[in-house]
Curated annotation (Swiss-Prot):
NAD(+) binds at Q126, V127, D146, T175, A206, S207, R208, D232, G257. Pathway: Cofactor biosynthesis; pyridoxine 5'-phosphate biosynthesis; pyridoxine 5'-phosphate from D-erythrose 4-phosphate: step 2/5. This is Erythronate-4-phosphate dehydrogenase. Pfam families: 2-Hacid_dh, 2-Hacid_dh_C, DUF3410. It is an enzyme of class 1 (oxidoreductase). It catalyses: 4-phospho-D-erythronate + NAD(+) = (R)-3-hydroxy-2-oxo-4-phosphooxybutanoate + NADH + H(+). Coiled coil: none annotated. Substrate binds at S45, T66, Y258. Keywords: Cytoplasm, NAD, Oxidoreductase, Pyridoxine biosynthesis. Homodimer. One of its GO terms (cellular component) is cytosol. It comes from Pseudomonas aeruginosa (strain UCBPP-PA14). Its EC number is 1.1.1.290. The active site is at R208, E237, H254 (proton donor).
Length: 380
């Protein structure tokens, strides 16, 4: 097999070395010419795999190490008989850790009690569903909007988007980017909906940039709208809007799901799909390539405040403010410089583990055990 992989996909050799020749390119450089002699294509979300790129090529399998598939022309894949796989849920836990870090930063700035907020989660798939589990596990009030899932689960606890936007203090977006169809999500939060948000609302977008109308959001924030905003995704990536970023409490370069586990899990999942497509046995597993966690065990004082414990456990693993600082330093120079910096921050992102690898002792206090279990950390 002739394999072409995005150079930023990790451990490709570990999984695919015995499957043929492997060539690597920057994801944004993968085009029609690059696919002239390729059987297997491995990409991330930065590569648009379209009819124009694939027509006439020998590509027979496409794997994307991402949850989303809006960069894949699935209609053409079906027409051309091209097998494909995404990596559903691969980085979901990393995104949840990111959102928790954003909420802690917002609460610190606002002097708010996270337990007293009402949370609205838009999109309850792999990421949003896990976030809902964590928030409800903490005992917090959560509203969920997911029309496609509601259609499949008519007895589920879902609300309309209008009700969620009207009642939630915190809105976290986790939808795919659908430009058409029954449930389009491009500019789901458009100017009228953004303008109607309650004063003091917190907004987190770690899904796709175009789910929020970035220009409308910037105009509102420049006009003094009382919102706290955390954006990890941007319209026109890798060209993020510096003026919009300046008005965000947290601004990062599409790294919410960049945990080490998430990255390696994504490669493992497309390898599994590739093996199934070829009808061959898997010879490598995720556990073969995943380093043992370096997170230290933590001992919580049984008398500590559960809210303090929550913040301490989350920040012991990840605090998005460090990524925010690095991103803001990159938002200088001309457009080409900023685009290159956006990709460089993602390419050279430091290893980050997930909260699920944290081992925590609580001295037997039930309230602290609830926090640990809700976060998905390990009780010892």
């Amino acid at each position: 097999m002739r394999i072409l992989a995005d150079e930023n996909i990790p451990v490709v050799d570990a999984f695919f070395a015995d499957q043929g020749s492997i060539r690597r390119l920057p994801g944004r450089a993968i085009d029609r010419a690059a696919l002239a002699e390729v059987d297997v294509l491995l990409v991330r979300s930065v590569t648009e795999v379209s009819r124009a790129a694939l027509a006439g090529s020998p590509v027979r399998f496409v794997g994307t190490c991402t949850i989303g598939t809006d960069h894949l022309d699935l209609d053409y894949f079906a027409e051309a008989g091209i097998a494909w796989s995404s990596a559903p849920g691969c980085n979901a836990r990393g995104v949840v850790d990111y959102v928790l870090g954003c909420l802690l930063a917002m609460a610190e700035v606002r002097g708010a009690d996270l337990a007293e907020r009402t949370y609205g989660v838009v999109g309850a798939g792999q990421v949003g569903g896990r976030l809902v589990e964590v928030l409800r596990g903490l005992g917090w009030k959560v509203l969920v909007c997911d029309p496609p899932r509601q259609a499949r689960e008519p007895d589920g606890e879902f609300v309309s988007l209008e009700r969620l936007l009207a009642e939630a203090d915190v809105i976290s977006l986790h939808t795919p980017l659908n430009r058409d169809g029954e449930h389009p999500t491009r500019h789901l939060l458009d100017e009228p909906r953004l303008a109607a948000l309650r004063p003091g609302t917190w907004l987190v977008n770690a899904s796709r940039g175009a789910v929020v109308d970035n220009q409308a959001l910037r105009r509102l924030l420049e006009g003094g709208a009382d919102l706290e905003v955390a954006l990890d995704v941007w319209e026109g990536e890798p060209q993020a809007d510096p003026e919009l970023a300046a008005h965000c409490l947290i601004a990062t370069p599409h790294i919410a799901g960049y945990s080490l586990e998430g990255k390696l899990r994504g490669t493992a999942q497309i390898y599994q799909a590739y093996c199934a497509w070829r009808g061959i046995a898997e010879r490598v597993s995720l556990q073969d390539v995943l380093p043992e966690t370096w997170l230290a065990g933590l001992q919580l004082n049984p008398g500590c405040d559960p809210a303090w414990a929550l913040a301490t456990l989350c920040r012991a693993v990840y605090d998005p403010r460090s990524d925010d600082a690095a991103f803001r330093r990159s938002l200088t120079g001309d457009s080409a410089t900023r685009r290159a910096a956006f990709d460089a921050l993602r390419k050279h992102y430091p290893p980050r583990r997930e909260i699920t690898g944290l081992r925590v002792a609580t001295g037997g206090r039930v309230e602290l055990q609830r926090v640990v279990r809700a976060l998905g950390a390990q009780l010892v």
